[in-house]
Structure formats: structure tokens, C-alpha cells
UniProtKB/Swiss-Prot annotation:
It is an enzyme of class 6 (ligase). Its EC number is 6.3.2.4. It comes from Bordetella parapertussis (strain 12822 / ATCC BAA-587 / NCTC 13253). Pathway: Cell wall biogenesis; peptidoglycan biosynthesis. This is D-alanine--D-alanine ligase. Mg(2+) 2 binds at E270, N272. The gene is ddl.
Amino acid sequence: MSKQFGKVGVLYGGRSAEREVSLMSGKGVHEALLSAGVDAHLFDTGERSLADLAAAGFERVFIALHGRYGEDGTLQGALELLGIPYTGSGPLASSLSMDKIMTKRVWLQHGLPTPAFEVLGGSTELRLVPDRLGLPLILKPPHEGSTVGITKVAGYSDMKAAYELAARFDAEVLAEQFITGRELTVAVLGSGAAARALPVIEIVAPGGNYDYEHKYFSDDTQYFCPADLPADVAADVAAVAERAYAALGCEGWGRVDFILDRENRPWLLEMNTSPGMTGHSLVPMAARAVGMSYADLCVAILAKAACKVRSPARQD
């Protein structure tokens, strides 16, 4: 099967705040595909142009980019125009999932549980937000990943600095109710009715601080896969993950992040349509739990590469 993929581009690097993580993901995917006999080539979208991409002769591409210009629908739209099959979700699902505000609105429309939130701008009276959402609360830029720009606000006096940090990345800032509980994540593979959740992972970071450093570079963070949950709770979390994935129109693969509260109720936090594929990443961990190696996972994702926008039949 590997030879049938033809010449494959592994798109990595890019220009987002998550470039460093993407470089690690891309190199890992590239090595795995080579080991599986795939004619794979690295392509850094932060250093090369779309014209270079069009001229490279790739028959399909594996998107190992994270954040803006790689995970937000812009690249996916360009690949649709170029007619190059690609991994993961299409332009619309990628755009919706990258925007944490729109993600939450879609989930609420589908009756899915997500913490209460407000959208903050320059005219917002910051001192009133904790009265509505409670303390502590979370402030984050809606278009960044890997915990970039996120602050857990403990008191009224922290609001201004937290807002200014998040506003460095976005014109709007997402304020979100803080739910005390266990941090979980669920990988989903496939599309449509065939999409299935992999085993639930629990993340336990030192001091409960699962930040950029603990995500990608620390050996102190603990991961439990499958998570130690009652069978009915694990099944409920997996079902909510599949519904959340479907509600946004995701395809191919993705990862859904949760908080499980003290009553074992899952609360949806974020959708990742191009999750990390580093040595510390969670989708490969979940795949291993069902007997799928890192290389097998990469090949399975690549096998589903496609253009997602369906052109209407021409009327001549």
C-alpha cells in the first residue's frame, strides 16, 4: 500500500507560534513514513511558497502543522485549489475548530457540554467578568493552541495582565468558567459514521499546570492510557468526543480535550484537527493502547488523505 501513495509531502514548520512543535511533529512523521516504505519528503511551509508546493509534484500531503496557517483552514483551502489530497479536516471544519469561540458555539447548538464563557474586547469592563463566570477563570486567545497565551486567573487583580497577554495574539479574548476536575483527552480516527474514539487518556501535570513546557519538554507530566475511569464514564466520554468531532464536521483524525468534573460529567474544552505527533504527544499514545504503532498510525492517517470540497457537476 505504501508505494500506492506516490510522492508524499510532509508539511511542517510553518509560521505560527507552534512552529517549534510542528518541526518535531513533522520530523517524526517523516521518519515513520520512510520506515514504512513511503516516498516521503519534508516541506517547511514557513520557508517555502505555495508555488514551490504546487511545483513539488506531491501526490498527497500529510499536514503536520499546528496553529495559524496550517490548522485554521487557510492551507486546506489552498490545497483544495491545487487539487492535492491532504490529511485531516477540510477548510470549514479546520477553521471552526481553530476558533475556540466558534467551536463552543457549535457545540452548544448541538446540545454538547462546554463551560460557560464570554467574549472579551477592548471595551469590556474586566472587573465585572469574574462576577459572572466566577473565580478562578481561564483567559485565552481563541486562535492559538499548545496553551499559548493562556492564564488561570485567581483574583480580580489578575484580570488586566491576563487579558493583555491573550490580546497580544487575538483581537478578541475568550474568558471561560474554570471547571475543577481531571484533565482528559480523546483521539478520534476516521470520518462520518466510521469515526471512532481511541482510549481515553488522563493527563496529570505537576501542580495541575499542563502548560507548553509540560506538554512538550517535561518528563514530570504523567499520562494514564487508558484512563482509570468506570467503564460507563469512559464510554460516555468517548461518545461525547465522537459527537463533538462530528458536530464540527471533522474528518480523518483529531483530538478532543475535556475536563471531567467531580460528578464525572465531561466538559468539552477544545478540538484539535492537527494534533501534535511528537515523542510526548497523545494521539500516538492512544493508538499504542490499541496495538497501533506510531508508523502504523501515520500510514493510517495518510491513507485517508483526500480533497474534501466537492465540486458540483458541470452543466454543459
